[in-house]
Amino acid sequence: TSTSHPQPAMIYDYYGFPEEAYQVTYPAPGCPELAARIAGLLGGEGIPYSVDTERGFDHGLFIPLMLMYPRADIPALQISLLRGLDARAHLALGHALSGLMSENILVIGSGFSFHNMRAFDWSGRETPDARNDEFQEWLIRVCTESEQHLARWEAAPAARYCHPREEHLLPLHVCAGMAQQPAELVFNDYILGKRAVAFLWS
């Protein structure tokens, strides 16, 4: 499913944060035309797809875009993950969208390479964590050399420690499926005390 409202509202799909976190606005326009085009691309590959003309933007979109385009002057839409959270299905989803790679469209796999809420250090201290390091090193190797191994990400070292649930990792699979080529490592640092990495496909 993708958003398709021409002026999406805000969805604050997080809990327990300061009041200011629920006053954020990002008034970027939607992009119904692209949503319809994506529907055609996915339908052509037999991937069930629908557009949601009511849903607004959640933090997976407005947080990164606020940093990149603070004036909210670009049209945007969101695509949801597939039910079942199957890694191969998300690689296939990306592959079905690969025709968009040659156009002036920015695709952000908005997630996190480490997402174990209980393991974060909310003070931000960088503490040694061998399991975290093992998984990040595996992810670097796979994304910069042989992205097809993402299909078996659960077999990676400390996979379920770093991702008790995979919804913050699977956006990476969609991007890798679109590009089908090695990525460039563009971020390798600490967030909330845990090492995290990010990649660019161009």
Language-model features: where?
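Catalytic beta-strand/loop module used to bind and position nucleotide/cofactor moieties
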Residues: S80, L97, S110
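Internal, conserved structured core segments that host functional sites
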Residues: A36-A89
